[in-house]
């Protein structure tokens, strides 16, 4: 699945999201997906080629690079974006199911007074209520979990969010502890901190949306007649 397909799917979900959910989707596309596609390759395009170690031992440089960068930053961020966006597919499938049921009832004549034609059913905004409320809320909950897990994995895997200029490596087949130098560490640190910060903003937006949904759910229950 390419980014265009993902955008079209999430764009469909966006029609039925809350205002906070629409802000989250905007942040996701502009500050994460577009930045990753446009700028990340320029920053990390030289990561292995310009990873220099002060040894001529065959294989030492590759082993040291694999030790300090087991997964490329770009691939990890791409995987994070895919995992974070996946829960929205649950909402998209649920909305599609609801529309299918309405079309079926319309064709049988059960709800002909509610809609003029099938096209109106297709364009109608689906309200977040009933079982769809639970699906939508669950998708946001998993988004928060995935964001937090990936931030933790990133921190553990790379020993923090700041790129070091020099790293030491004594893995086999290196003859001794060798010094290895990372290309453009400051630029990569700035980019990493930016991506992590945006990820944190997305978590805050998701938590805010969860609170909003629960408050609206509770206020709706309190208004029901006893």
UniProtKB/Swiss-Prot annotation:
It is found in: Cell membrane; Cell junction, Gap junction. Its main location: membrane. Detected in cochlea (at protein level). Detected in cochlea. Liver, kidney, intestine, lung, spleen, stomach, testis and brain, but not heart and adult skeletal muscle. Residues 14-20, 95-135, 211-226 are cytoplasmic. Ca(2+) binds at residues 42, 45, 47. It is a multi-pass membrane protein. GO terms for molecular function: calcium ion binding; gap junction channel activity; gap junction channel activity involved in cell communication by electrical coupling; identical protein binding. One of its GO terms (biological process) is gap junction assembly. It comes from Mus musculus. The chain crosses the membrane at residues 21-40, 74-94, 136-156, 190-210. Structural component of gap junctions. Gap junctions are dodecameric channels that connect the cytoplasm of adjoining cells. They are formed by the docking of two hexameric hemichannels, one from each cell membrane. Small molecules and ions diffuse from one cell to a neighboring cell via the central pore. InterPro entries: Connexin, Connexin26, Connexin_CCC, Connexin_CS, Connexin_N, Connexin_N_sf. PANTHER family: CONNEXIN, GAP JUNCTION BETA-2 PROTEIN. SMART domains: CNX, Connexin_CCC. GO terms for cellular component: connexin complex; gap junction; plasma membrane. This is Gap junction beta-2 protein. The gene is Gjb2. A hemichannel or connexon is composed of a hexamer of connexins. A functional gap junction is formed by the apposition of two hemichannels. Forms heteromeric channels with GJB4. Interacts with CNST. Residues 2-13 dip into the membrane without crossing it. Residues 41-73, 157-189 are extracellular.
